[in-house]
């Protein structure tokens, strides 16, 4: 079964039937409107974010499968913080504040793409990204929180999400 993979970045829940997607789908004999509708349904939970998508097409049967990737850590943090873009000067200009719980949820969402093995390490990685884009966490510099996480100050909160972390497949 010869398959063709189409890898594209789409705006979550807002895929349009235009180039470069439409001509590619047409060449493969697929119904463009139907594929676009399914793409919008599959990416609706990432509305307004850039989402990596792979469409696997069986060239013989014209059957296809849509695989939705996970947006970048930056995109997820910005969405949670209600900001549209990173700070141009993250050291001095803050663009939003998140709770540590929000950061933990993003870490869990990103687990399949991370090389870290523990939730604690993943959260520290998310905090590093938050610092670089000008997002504070718990109204503090994320660097401070990294230290507090290492010291065990948030072990109870992390333990609350440990099962959820362990259930996510890598």
Curated annotation (Swiss-Prot):
Coiled coil (UniProt feature): none
BP-aspect Gene Ontology terms: translation
Keywords: Ribonucleoprotein, Ribosomal protein, RNA-binding, rRNA-binding
S-adenosyl-L-methionine in keyword set: no
One Gene Ontology MF term: structural constituent of ribosome
A cellular component term, taken from the record's GO annotations: large ribosomal subunit
Entries under CDD domains matching the protein: Ribosomal_L11
InterPro entries tied to this protein: Ribosomal_uL11, Ribosomal_uL11_C, Ribosomal_uL11_C_sf, Ribosomal_uL11_CS, Ribosomal_uL11_N, Ribosomal_uL11_N_sf
Family: Belongs to the universal ribosomal protein uL11 family.
HAMAP family with a match to the protein in the record: Ribosomal_uL11
Subunit structure: Part of the ribosomal stalk of the 50S ribosomal subunit. Interacts with L10 and the large rRNA to form the base of the stalk. L10 forms an elongated spine to which L12 dimers bind in a sequential fashion forming a multimeric L10(L12)X complex.
Function: Forms part of the ribosomal stalk which helps the ribosome interact with GTP-bound translation factors.
Protein name: Large ribosomal subunit protein uL11
Phylogenetic placement of the source organism: Archaea, Thermoproteota, Thermoprotei, Sulfolobales, Sulfolobaceae
Gene that this sequence comes from: rpl11
